[in-house]
Amino acid sequence: TSRPLKHKFAVRYPHSFDHGYEYGLVTADNRLLLGGWRNHSPTGEVGTYSIDVNPHIEEGLKQFARDHYDIVEEIDWEFSWSGIMAASKTGLPFIGPTTSPRVYACCAYTGHGFSWGHGSAKLLADIIAGSDVPAVARFFNPKAGF
């Protein structure tokens, strides 16, 4: 994620490139937030459990920003992080109570946390609050297992 930029972005909402393998958004304070690039890693990061930032991916995303955004100012990258990809058998995220008391899950986005995150958090909050939830929520049950 960059420091706030002066650049006037034409697209501020979440967007993706390369069939969703690279994605970005512009924050309210005009920072460029990018993610993805794992498909350019020799292993695709399959089987890795490290949360250390992969320099190949980080540099790839910085080059991606230079190649795909018409930003003339120097981009100062303030934040960088990594995460472990998780997937369920169905490819759908887990949202709801687990088999442990008072433990809930909101995970296993199969790399699509950008698109699933906000709605999943809302659904989990409704589940915890005991509010009515849509019938489709049963498909996200963590008790179904990985």
Regions found by a protein language model. Give the residues of each.
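Gly/Ser/Thr-rich active-site loops/lids in small-molecule metabolic enzymes
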Residues: 1, 51-61
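Alpha-helix initiation and capping sites
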Residues: 18, 55-59, 71
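C-terminal catalytic lobe of FAD-dependent flavoproteins
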Residues: 40-52, 63-146
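Flavin-dependent oxidoreductases
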Residues: 1-32
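Conserved phosphate-coordination/catalytic loops
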Residues: 15, 55, 86
